[in-house]
Curated annotation (Swiss-Prot):
Residues 95-300 form the ABC transmembrane type-1 domain. This is Probable peptide ABC transporter permease protein y4tP. Keywords: Amino-acid transport, Cell inner membrane, Cell membrane, Membrane, Plasmid, Transmembrane, Transmembrane helix, Transport. PROSITE patterns: ABC_TM1. It comes from Sinorhizobium fredii (strain NBRC 101917 / NGR234). The chain crosses the membrane at residues 9-29, 101-121, 137-157, 177-197, 236-256, 280-300.
């Protein structure tokens, strides 16, 4: 196990190095100039050139990359080119809404998705199974922002049951915090519920056809014990993989969802940074997301040994 973890850590360093190079080049080669955005539409070429020099954008790309990479290795992710506020400080101010939305979405997606998939497999071809097929088709095909606007129209504008937009900190009360997160959470959960449910159903169907499941039924095991003690445990590896992938990919959905519901989280910060060509913010967020994705994959691989003792590294 120790050798495997060490090998994965070494490969992680290599992956993060390549990701850093790709992110740096992608932003630098993309259209747009942060100096021109800062200077404004009425600025002269000399003013833009002076700002580029202040930001170090007039240096060769290899030199810019070395400066940026060395700062990152020291834990210095720079400051916003517009506000001058350190990037980590900006992220810490936006962290609570994003974490709240992500955690609630993951809880809802896993709970409903796994339960839906188990029931669909247990009654394959029945009403629940057909309902899952319909729901999955909708969840896969309809964009997150469309789902968000539909929910806003029915549950916020027409019925006025829930807030339309915005966010209330949990420090100001659990009830308003939760009410403001219901619509964003449901919106972001729809595609992940569909994804997790379909994979759970397929994995459960494969396990339910095994001989030991028929043996358990012959011994008088209850349906609950057969489903959740025997079948779900043995079907857990692909389900855990899907949950890990869903959590890692959720960041992209968070950006759209926070924009639709005007949630002041990291997603909104990234959108504003892209509009303003604020390189330090974009680079930092992309690097942190990449690191989180790699870490989640490592944790999922290690969790396999807890679900299935036959797996050894």
């Amino acid at each position: 196990m120790g050798v495997y973890i060490l090998r994965r850590l070494v490969s992680t360093i290599a992956v993060m190095a390549m990701v850093g190079i790709f992110i740096f080049l992608l932003l630098r080669l993309a259209p747009g100039d942060p100096a021109a955005v800062i200077a404004g539409p009425t600025a002269t070429e000399q003013m833009v050139a002076n700002i580029r020099e202040e930001l170090g954008l007039n240096e060769p790309l290899p030199v810019q990359f070395v400066h940026w990479a060395s700062d990152v290795l020291r834990g210095n992710f720079g400051a916003s080119v517009f506000t001058g506020v350190p990037v980590l400080q900006l992220l810490s101010q936006r962290l609570e809404p994003t974490i709240s939305l992500s955690v609630l979405t993951m809880i809802l997606s896993v709970t409903v998705g796994v339960s839906f998939g188990v029931l669909a497999a247990w009654r394959s071809g029945g009403f629940v199974d057909r309902a899952l097929a319909t729901f999955s088709a909708i969840g896969y095909s309809v964009p997150v922002f469309v789902i968000g606007y539909i929910l806003i129209y029915f549950f916020a504008i027409q019925t006025r049951w829930l807030p339309v937009q915005g966010y209330t900190s949990i420090n100001q009360g659990v009830a308003p915090w939760f009410l403001h997160l219901i619509l964003p959470t449901v919106t972001l959960s729809v595609p992940y519920i569909a994804f997790i449910a379909r994979i759970t159903r397929g994995s459960m169907l494969e396990v339910l056809s095994e001989d030991y499941m028929r043996t358990a039924a012959a011994k008088g095991a209850s349906p609950f014990a057969m489903l959740f003690h025997h079948a779900l445990k043995n079907a857990g590896v692909p389900i855990l993989t899907v949950i890990g992938i869903s959590f890692a990919y959720m960041i992209g959905g968070v950006v759209l969802t926070e924009t639709v519901f005007n949630v002041p989280g990291i997603g909104r910060l990234v959108v504003d940074a892209i509009k303003n060509r604020d390189y330090p913010i974009i680079q930092t967020v992309l690097v942190l997301i990449s690191g989180l994705y790699v870490l989640i994959n490592l944790l999922v691989d290690l969790a396999y040994t807890l679900i299935d003792p036959r797996i050894r590294y």
